[in-house]
Amino acid sequence: MKKNKIQILIILTILMFTMLACEASVSTAKITDAYLTPNEDGSGNFTVFSGDQTFYCVVKVANAPEDTTLKAVWTAVDVEGVDPNLFISEFELTTESENEFTFNLQNDQLWPSGSYKVEIFMNGTLEKTLEFEVQ
């Protein structure tokens, strides 16, 4: 019985040191702000656009390590002449030392009137959805 206790103690000690040796990677990265604008410089916060504008999505992050991924998924939710919830495009980037990132979506033709959205993912998790209109 005493031999079993010693073996269990040795196994627990080995497990404890193994767990301590493993590096825990917990990110505190978060999106502090996200908004849409037709302005390339990122100024303004818009929810209504005209059909000839480029959509800029500005995303501000905090505590993001250099390997954090951000993804913007653009969708036509309820738009004239297209199926509901039509996927338009997506863009993904990996953060470096910056804390502000801009995604954009443009069209060679006029954007059809209707409801759109852009979903912002951080490290594969949906963090924010911005809805907007084209009139």
Please identify what each model-predicted range represents.
Residues 2-9:
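Bacterial N-terminal signal peptides that target proteins for export
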Residues 18-21:
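C-terminal motif of bacterial Sec signal peptides marking the signal peptidase cleavage site
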Residues 23-115, 119-131:
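Contiguous segments within soluble domain cores/interaction surfaces
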